[in-house]
Amino acid sequence: MNTVPEPSAELLARAGAVRLAAVELGQTNNGQRSRALHAMADALQERSSLIVAANVQDLERSEAEGLASALMARLKLDATKLQAAIDGVRKVASLPDPLGLRQLHRELDTDLVLERITVPLGVVGVIFEARPDAVVQIASLAIRSGNGALLKGGSEARCTNEAVMDALRAGLAREESDVSPDALALLTTREESLGLLRLDGLVDLIIPRGSNELVRFIQDNTRIPVLGHADGVCHLYVDAAADVMKATRVAVDSKTQYPAACNAIETLLVHRSIATAFLAAAVPAFQAAGVTLRGDAESQSLGVNESAQEEDWSTEYLDLTLSVRVVDDLACATEHIRRYGSRHTEVILTEDLATADRFLAAVDSAGVYHNCSSRFADGFRYGFGAEVGISTQTLPPRGPVGLEGLVTYRYRLRGNGHIAADYAAGRRSFTHQDLPL
């Protein structure tokens, strides 16, 4: 961690303020946090024109600087996208309270009762690129789950991020809110984002949302636990028993509905026995949607124009480019996914339920789907209200991370003068009786 400087005195002070506010926030009740979220949504609504105008500034500057088209798509926050984010805040406010849930209730002995209760993590630090709507999502989930948040967005979204954060903090400052605005803070410089990595003791979890390089750098340069994913190299496998028309429709949606998203497919795998019929329908459909296809020799003989190179199989294009490969069978498809995939989201299209079940069991990704678009890998679409990120790690939380990924638990033990010596000496014995939750 020699490349990461010590945090500045100013950053330490800001992080300390967030920590103190988070302690108070963690003691609020469900109604208080819900009212605070509605106040945040109201403030965003009232300032929506200012936020959209700030986003136009960011878009114009980024276009002039030659920002990649995939990042430009993520950067855009128009009125429709902003309204969806505001609606998401209200949705989060209506979700069941994630705090204070009793997960375990056990009598260890008479008048000695153990409970396991859900509690906030404390303070989360989130580093993300280009996505200003992520500020809204993350802030709302943090407040709902009783956590403070330090957020660092990409410099390309600076004006938008500041306008959004100003609105969120203004909402928390309203009379109807019992949550301190200090629970949320926006970091704006590279020095602050590097300093964030050294805030162990003040920050409990770091969530990176961005490129593989960003995630790897953070994982290698902090002692704070990191939750996140790097690449989203998602696959769609068209089985021999697929319905061609259904498969074409789902495959096109999985690529083109929002190609800059991490849950868009990057590689299409097609069973050899259906390749001729499927590609005859799919290639024109993809071409009509503006998708560039890069394939192996067999798929090129069936209409794919460009040749795929070895690096294409492991590339997250985040654009209208798709790799295509013809495979012998399900085993070849799953082996390809194991070798090149990023354990994000994989899809099988088939009318054979037994084959689908084998795929769902064999593929070790955060999401495995049967006969539906990969684009459903999203916290809002899962009914989480929003997501703080997507985790491709094996340990939980995994996949789209909503409120459940921002809470931990605490053991509470209530006794009446009980001492361990009595049990060690055999004067008392444990009953270990589970009680109703």
From Swiss-Prot:
One of its GO terms (biological process) is L-proline biosynthetic process. It comes from the Bacteria. InterPro entries: Ald_DH/histidinol_DH, Ald_DH_C, Ald_DH_N, Aldehyde_DH_dom, G-glutamylP_reductase_CS, Glu-5-SA_DH, GPR_dom. It comes from Synechococcus sp. (strain CC9902). Pfam families: Aldedh. GO terms for cellular component: cytoplasm. Belongs to the gamma-glutamyl phosphate reductase family. The gene is proA. Transmembrane segments: none annotated. This is Gamma-glutamyl phosphate reductase.
